[in-house]
Structure formats: structure tokens, C-alpha cells
Swiss-Prot record:
GO molecular function list: GTP binding; hydrolase activity; mRNA 5'-cap (guanine-N7-)-methyltransferase activity; mRNA guanylyltransferase activity; RNA binding
Region (N7-methyltransferase activity): 171-245, 429-555
Highest taxon in the source lineage: Viruses
GO biological process: symbiont-mediated suppression of host innate immune response; viral process
InterPro entries named in the record: VP3_Rotav
Species of provenance: Rotavirus A (strain RVA/Human/Japan/S2/1980/G2P1B[4])
Stated name of the protein: Protein VP3
Keywords attached to this entry: GTP-binding, Host-virus interaction, Hydrolase, Inhibition of host innate immune response by virus, Methyltransferase, mRNA capping, mRNA processing, Multifunctional enzyme, Nucleotide-binding, Nucleotidyltransferase, RNA-binding, S-adenosyl-L-methionine, Transferase, Viral immunoevasion, Virion
Catalytic activity, reaction form: a 5'-end diphospho-ribonucleoside in mRNA + GTP + H(+) = a 5'-end (5'-triphosphoguanosine)-ribonucleoside in mRNA + diphosphate; a 5'-end (5'-triphosphoguanosine)-ribonucleoside in mRNA + S-adenosyl-L-methionine = a 5'-end (N(7)-methyl 5'-triphosphoguanosine)-ribonucleoside in mRNA + S-adenosyl-L-homocysteine; 5'-triphosphoadenylyl-(2'->5')-adenylyl-(2'->5')-adenosine + 2 H2O = 2 AMP + ATP + 2 H(+)
GO cellular component, one term: viral nucleocapsid
Family: Belongs to the rotavirus VP3 family.
Localization (cell): Virion
Role of this protein: Multifunctional enzyme involved in mRNA capping. Catalyzes the formation of the 5' cap structure on the viral plus-strand transcripts. Specifically binds to GTP and displays guanylyltransferase and methyltransferase activities. Has affinity for ssRNA but not for dsRNA. Capping activity is non-specific and caps RNAs that initiate with either a G or an A residue. Together with VP1 polymerase, forms a VP1-VP3 complex positioned near the channels situated at each of the five-fold vertices of the core. Counteracts the host innate immune response thanks to its phosphodiesterase that degrades the 5'-triphosphorylated, 2'-5' linked adenylate oligomers produced by the host cell IFN-inducible 2',5'-oligoadenylate synthetase (OAS). The host RNaseL is therefore not activated.
Length: 835
């Protein structure tokens, strides 16, 4: 949802839009809670409070002040990510298709012939890093830019088996127009940039597990972050390959040679970061014009020095000349060298051309070895061709996508590799590597071993759920790692599937109850965004490829109502109850009936089950930004930090009742996952709360009334306001609590309206209006370790007779309290008080 704050109402009506006017009788937190549970996508918030907007944004719900109609029109028609700290809106708006254009934020693409293969009459537009060049389109009171691009489709095409780009991009645009927006993926770059900048400032050592190419620009400015990936393809790994011949397969209609060069250099750069943890000088020989340097410089201040007879416009220092082996002495330490020397074939005979290529390959290798033979802190990536070669066994082979698969591949070496044992590799084996291997990632660092790190902050986004990892080891890491942000695939199946397929892999699935963490926040993507200064206008699809975000060691843990809070907890319930269900009271009715409380009079105002816990369980797929386990734990320990709002502290037994209702709901819906989740949350409640039951009571609290509007034949009709199992030494403590609640007890608005048979030969009158006070007193007794209340639900009633009688219905009648007393069962009254 998105909340657009206005000082004045607007005359125009918008689809899927609701108006909310700030309620001055409620504080900012209550207003935020009410807004968050509205069911439309767009909320026009009138007479707004800035504090309420802050609360919503911290909760991950995009909430923005609107000053002009242009701002309203722009934000209401698309989704966006909002940086509420820096006041920047990142639109995810594809309406630019109506200009017959596709967009990119990678400059090198604009220098290719891609426009020859677009839809007829279409063009390509460069929009800058996260759409920064579009800021001029929006003259708004906040900074606004459109981060939507088609780079995801272009890159997917490059790695696909499709050759016809026009057909491919047409299909992708049609898909984009007919399927739900993948909002998390679109906002992820904004999130990653914010996340790693924040963590790099706050933590000395940061470890990142499982980066992919989507992050290849994100980490350019973070050389100290330690990366873990799937490891490199080494020369010695070719021993498994059978010999093949030249294939000559075209991968792309438009020229992607620059993309290949960029990936080669970035792979080398990140290998340098991995070893030396600082930025090198980047030397490049023969890869002009290297327009992609412009892209790299949008993210980092890396320095490039280049050699080529052709211009390299974005190099810091370009030598418009050939590079010879004697020029190696001009190259400094603390550097990487990219060698991409290859003479154009022109009209040369094929055999002559082949001889020249092999000779240049040998020369390139000599330059690489000479560069690595002296000095320190150096890594080299050199262009190779398939030929009989001796190569160091520990050198890394690279084969990033290029326009055509021919004879070309690349070799990456550091100083140690260049001095290592060399092995003869036949030409046919290298062709086998080239024909069958595409390097899919610029991050080729070693895999992460699933163990805790004492002084490091671990980040693992979408990296650990894969079933190649041992599930128990993943759980153990999350339980024990002190500082981390780790994601795992949420179990949003209905049959409690232990793993689910995604693309061509399988992921383990998890619920919050799979982890034993008492210092971590377990939330959703949008809940995590709020913690890092971002909010989003569209939540993830409830049955999509969704993840739990687990933050350990955060200073936000105790701020229960500010982050990963209960905002939107009733939203799905409202959507169902006010549209599909038999009555808008369905949730209240079901919760009472499923706990054998059949008095439904006033069920919507006097309910004995925690609606928070019930909704958090049965609709967890729709809102798991609310960290239910943390909410339970902090209340059980009394450590919850509450900033504001009308906050009602549930008695632990209300939480148990909610689990029982959720369990009943799950059985009716055949939802095996919710059934397990409810059981495990109930077990967790029993673990963190020391709940005892007075199922064998020796005292009770009685309420005697001045008026009973029914016939009765018991000696003194009374309401049993709970039973206790206590020693005589505890009587003074019980009496102190009763005295403390005297005014509230006598102030209860107690009513009755019918009689019924509670059981065979037990004829009673219903009682309404006491549950709220009952649970407050329950909490007071619980905190003093006084056993109060039974394991079955407390159903308020007055016993009238121990015989079978007919039900009587009367007008709702108020009952007036005469006295409240504490009496021993089958014994004497030990305390009483009157109003």
C-alpha cells in the first residue's frame, strides 16, 4: 500500500483509493495502525501528522507528503521505493513504453547496434544510475527519479538460448504488462546500495555470501567487504573434459563485446579485492573504446590507464599507441592488468590469421608473466585462444558471454598462480571448455563454510536456502551468528513442503519457529526495508518466492512498535471479512466458538482471544513483517520498548487461545503449514511464559450482585471471577492485587440477557462485560507468580440452579455489584470489599 498525505481533499476519484482523515482523538501510532489496515492500495491521508508518516515508513509502508497535484498523479499511478531518510522516491514506472522506448542504466548498451533489433519505431534511452538522469522530469517537493529499466530483460537475453532479440524483448514487455510487478527485485538495487553503505560505516568487517551479477556495481566502492561465491573454474578442472572442435555459435544479434570486457575486468577487480581489500589501478591494453568505463565510474572512483591506437574516451589516462612487452616496466604495483590484444582479421587468409592469433596469444601470455614476475599486489586477466598450451594449474578460466562463441577465452592469474605448476592443455580440451561453459558471475570467490564468525557481520541475501546446503547447518548458523542479515525461503506452501522448486533449483523452506533466536528480528522484505531507511508501496505476493529476513545484533530489537511491528496485521482479515465472509464479525465469532465460548453477544468488543496472534498465524503469508516471536518474547520478559499507541498487553492465556483458534482454522482450510506453525507458536509461548493452571483450585474470587433478574434456587448466586491454587502465605499478595483493581472491578459494565444449561443439571445466566478486566487481573497475578485461571477458557456465568431448566431470554440488563470477595473452596471468606 502507499499513503499519500494531503492537506486538502481532491475532487478527482481514483481507482482502488480510500480517504483517511487524521483522528485527533487518537495518537499518531493509533492513526498509523488504522491506516495500515485499510484495504485499498492507495490511501489519501488528510490533515496528516508527520509523526504518523514516520511511523508508517519505519514499518516499511511508503508514506509521503504531497504538495502538488503533479506529485499525486505520478505517485498514484505507479509503485515505488521511498528513501524516507534522504527524501528520494525511486519510481518503478514502465509508462515510458508509451513513448516507444526501452530504457537502460548501462551506458555501454547505447554504444551498440541494439536499436537495429528493437520493435519498429522504438528507441533505447539511457537513464543513468538508478534512473538519476530522469530527475529533471519531475519538478517535485521531494527528489524523484524513475529507476525502471529493461536491463533485466536485456541481460536475460544475453544469457538465454534465444537469438531473435526483437521477439525476446516483445515477449518480455508483454509479460511485464500482464503479470504482477516483481517489486522486491526492482527495489533490491536501491536496498543493496543503502544496506552496504550503512553496514560498512557501522561495522569494521563485513562478509557477503552469494553475490550475483546484479550486484556487480554495488560493491565497486566496498573493497573491504569479503565476498563468498561458488568458486572459480580452474585450469586443472579441464582434466574432466573430452576434446571437441570449433563450434562458432552466435549468442547475440547485437554486439556485446564490451559487456564481455566489462565482466572480465570486474571479475579480476573483485578477485583483487578478495586478496588485498583495497582499490587497485586498472591497466587495460587493447580493449578500446571501453565505453563501459563510464558505467563503472557512476559507482566508484577507480582509476583507469589504457593503451590502444583507438580512443578510449572515459579512461583517466589513455595512451593512443601500441603496448609492447618492454612497456611492462611502466606498470605499477597495487594494480590489475587486462590484456585484450587481438589484430583484426580484415582480408587475411584464414590460416595466416590463425597463425597470427596463436602468436599474439603467446605474446599476451609473456606480457602477463612479466607483469606478475616483479612487484607486489598484482592480478592479470589475459585474452587467450584455443590452442595447445601449458598453463598454471591454479589459474582461473573465464568465458563470459560475448557476441559469438569462437576460439576465445580468458585466463586470470595472480603472482602465486604464475609461479605454480603448469600443465599441458590440448586445443580440443579448451574448445570443450569454450563450447560448454559460460561464466555466469563476476564473483568467483570461494564458497562459504556454514559456520559462525566471531567479529564479522554476515550478509547472506537469497544465498543459503538452496538444498545444496545442509538445512541443519543453516539453522545453526542463524541461531548462533551474533551479527548478521540472513534470508531464507519462507514456507508459504499449504502442505508444509520441506523444499520447493524455483527455476532449476530447489530451496529449503523455513518458518520463524525453525529458529531459536532471542536477539534477532525475523521479518519480511518490506519490514527489513523500514529498518534501513526505506519503504515500499507494494508488498510481496503472498504465494511468491518470498524470504524471511533475519537480523541479528540490531539495536532496533527492543523497539517493538517502531520496526517489524504490528502494522497491517488485520489487513488481510479486513479484506476477507468485509468482502467474502458470512459476516464482518466472522473472525470474532470463529475465535470464540473454536474455544467453546458460545456467548457471542458483544463478541466484537469482548473477545477472549488475541486477534493479533490469530491473524499473525492464519494470514502469515500476507503479513510476516510483524515479528510474532519477538513480540511474544519481549512481552514475556517485560523488555518491550513501547513509544506510543493504545497498547493492550495480552494475558499469556489469550495467546494460547489464539493458537487453538488458528489450529482449528488450519484444519478447516486443510492448511498443514499453519497447523504446524500454530502448534509451534503455542509451544514457544509455553516455553517463554511460565504458565500454571489452577485446574485443582482451592480459592475463588466471587462477585455478588445486588440484583439477579432470574429465578434461582442456589443460596447466593454469584459470578466466579476466576479460581486460584495458592498457599495461605500467598493470600496477602492476592488481596493486595484485588485492592489495586478495586475501582476497575466495581466499574465494570456487567450485563446479562439469557440463561442456558452450562452442562447437565447446571443452569446458569450469561455474563458480559468482564473479560477485559479479567485478563488484566490475570496478568497481575501472573507477574507475581500466583496461579490463577484454569486451562480451559474462562466463560463468565452465574449459576442459578443445579437442575435442568428452560432457557430464558430477557432484555439486556445491567447488573450492579454488591461485593467482591476471596473465599476458600468449601471454606470461609478470607477477604471481601464493597464499592
Amino acid at each position: 500500500m502507499k499513503v499519500l498525505a494531503l492537506r486538502h481533499s481532491v475532487a478527482q476519484v481514483y481507482a482502488d483509493t480510500q480517504v483517511y482523515t487524521h483522528d485527533d482523538s487518537k495518537d499518531e501510532y493509533e492513526n498509523a495502525f488504522l491506516i495500515s489496515n485499510l484495504t485499498t492500495h492507495n490511501i489519501l491521508y488528510l490533515n496528516y501528522s508527520v509523526k504518523t508518516l514516520q511511523i508508517l515508513n519505519k514499518s516499511g509502508i511508503a508514506a509521503i507528503e504531497i504538495q502538488k497535484m503533479d506529485e499525486l498523479f505520478t505517485l498514484i499511478r505507479c509503485n515505488f521505493t521511498y528513501d524516507y531518510i534522504d527524501d528520494v522516491v525511486y519510481l518503478h514506472d514502465y509508462s515510458y513504453y508509451t513513448n516507444n522506448e526501452i530504457r537502460t542504466d548501462q551506458h555501454w548498451i547505447t554504444k551498440t547496434n541494439i536499436e537495429d533489433y528493437l520493435l519498429p519505431g522504438w528507441k533505447l534511452t539511457y537513464v543513468g544510475y538508478n534512473g538519476s538522469d530522469t530527475r529533471g522530469h519531475y519538478n517535485f517537493s521531494f527528489r524523484c527519479q524513475n529507476a525502471a529499466t529493461d536491463d533485466d530483460a536485456i541481460i536475460e537475453y544475453i544469457y538465454s538460448d534465444e537469438l531473435d532479440f526483437q521477439s525476446f524483448i516483445l515477449k518480455k514487455i508483454k509479460e511485464r504488462m500482464t503479470t504482477s510487478l516483481p517489486i522486491a527485485r526492482l527495489s533490491n538495487r536501491v536496498f543493496r546500495d543503502k544496506l552496504f553503505k550503512t553496514l560498512s560505516v557501522n561495522h569494521d568487517k563485513v562478509v557477503n555470501i552469494g553475490p550475483r551479477n546484479e550486484s556487480m556495481f554495488t560493491f565497486l566502492d566496498h573493497p573491504s567487504i569479503k565476498q563468498f561465491s561458488n568458486g572459480p573454474y580452474l585450469v586443472k578442472d579441464t582434466i574432466k573434459l573430452k576434446q571437441e572442435r570449433w563450434l562458432g555459435k552466435r549468442l547475440s544479434q547485437f554486439d556485446i563485446g564490451q559487456y564481455k570486457n566489462m565482466l572480465n575486468v570486474l571479475t579480476t577487480l573483485y578477485q583483487y579485492y578478495d586478496i588485498y581489500h583495497e582499490k587497485p589501478i586498472v591497466y587495460m591494453i587493447g580493449s578500446a573504446p571501453s565505453y563501459w568505463i563510464y558505467d563503472v565510474k557512476q559507482y566508484s572512483d577507480l582509476k583507469f590507464e589504457t593503451w590502444d591506437p583507438l580512443d578510449t574516451p572515459y579512461s583517466n589516462l589513455h595512451h593512443k599507441e601500441l603496448f609492447y612487452i618492454n612497456d611492462v616496466q611502466r606498470l605499477k604495483d597495487n594494480s590489475i592488468l587486462y590484456i585484450d590484444i587481438r589484430t583484426d582479421r580484415g582480408t587475411m587468409d584464414w590460416k595466416e590469421w590463425r597463425k597470427m592469433v596463436e602468436r599474439q596469444t603467446t605474446d599476451n601470455l609473456h606480457i602477463a608473466y612479466k607483469y606478475l614476475s616483479t612487484g607486489k599486489a598484482k592480478i592479470c586477466c589475459v585474452k587467450m585462444t584455443a590452442m595447445d598450451l601449458e598453463l598454471p594449474i591454479s589459474a582461473k578460466l573465464l568465458h563470459h558471454p560475448t557476441t559469438e562463441i569462437r576460439s576465445e577465452f580468458y585466463l586470470m592469474m595472480d603472482i602465486w598462480d604464475s609461479k605454480n605448476i603448469k600443465r599441458f592443455i590440448p586445443k580440443g580440451v579448451l574448445y570443450s571448455y569454450i563450447n560448454n561453459t559460460i561464466t555466469e558471475n563476476v564473483f568467483i570467490q570461494q564458497p562459504f563454510k556454514l559456520k559462525t564468525l566471531k567479529n564479522e557481520y554476515i550478509i547472506a541475501l537469497y544465498a543459503l536456502s538452496n538444498d545444496l546446503n545442509n538445512r541443519e547447518d543453516v539453522v545453526k548458523l542463524i541461531n548462533n551468528q551474533k551479527k548478521a542479515l540472513i534470508t531464507v525461503r519462507i514456507n508459504n506452501t499449504f502442505k508444509d513442503e520441506p523444499k520447493v522448486g524455483f527455476k532449476n533449483i530447489y530451496d529449503w523452506t523455513f518458518l520463524p519457529t525453525d529458529f531459536e533466536t532471542n536477539g534477532s528480528i525475523i521479518t519480511s522484505y518490506d519490514g527489513c526495508l523500514g529498518i534501513f531507511g526505506l519503504s515500499i508501496s507494494l508488498a510481496s505476493k503472498p504465494t511468491g518466492n518470498n524470504h524471511l529476513f533475519i537480523l541479528s545484533g540490531t539495536d532496533k530489537y527492543f523497539k517493538l512498535d517502531q520496526f517489524a511491528n504490528h502494522m497491517s496485521i488485520s489487513r488481510r482479515s479486513h479484506q476477507i471479512r468485509f468482502s467474502e465472509s458470512a459476516t464482518s464479525y466472522s473472525g470474532y465469532i470463529f475465535r470464540d466458538l473454536s474455544n467453546n465460548n458460545f456467548n457471542l453477544i458483544g463478541t466484537n468488543v469482548e473477545n477472549s482471544v488475541s486477534g493479533h496472534v490469530y491473524n499473525a498465524l492464519i494470514y502469515y503469508r500476507y503479513n510476516y513483517s510483524f515479528d510474532l516471536k519477538r513480540w511474544i518474547y519481549l512481552h514475556s520478559t517485560g523488555k518491550a520498548s513501547i513509544e506510543g499507541g493504545k497498547y493492550y498487553e495480552h494475558a499469556p492465556i489469550e495467546l494460547i487461545y489464539a493458537c487453538r483458534s488458528a489450529r482449528e482454522f488450519a484444519k478447516l482450510q486443510d492448511d498443514v503449514t499453519v497447523l504446524r506453525y500454530s502448534n509451534e507458536i503455542e509451544n514457544y509461548i509455553n516455553k517463554v511464559y511460565s504458565i500454571t493452571y489452577a485446574d485443582d483450585p482451592n480459592y475463588f474470587i466471587g462477585v455478588k450482585f445486588k440484583n439477579i433478574p432470574y429465578k434461582y434456587n442456589v443460596k447466593v448466586p454469584h459470578l466466579t471471577f476466576g479460581v486460584l491454587n495458592i498457599s495461605e502465605q500467598m493470600l496477602p499478595d492476592v488481596i493486595v492485587i484485588l485492592k489495586k483493581f478495586k475501582n476497575e472491578l466495581f466499574g465494570m459494565e456487567i450485563t446479562t440477557s439469557y440463561t442456558y444449561m452450562l452442562s447437565d443439571e447446571v443452569y446458569v445466566a450469561n455474563i458480559s462485560g468482564v473479560l477485559s478486566t479479567y485478563f488484566k487481573i490475570y496478568n497481575a497475578f501472573y507477574k507475581e507468580q500466583i496461579t490463577f485461571g484454569q486451562s480451559r477458557m474462562f466463560i463468565p456465568h452465574v449459576t442459578l440452579s443445579f437442575s435442568n431448566e428452560k432457557t430464558v431470554r430477557i432484555d439486556n440488563t445491567k447488573l450492579y455489584i454488591d461485593s467482591i470477595y476471596l473465599r476458600k473452596i468449601k471454606g470461609d471468606t478470607v477477604f471481601d470489599m464493597t464499592g
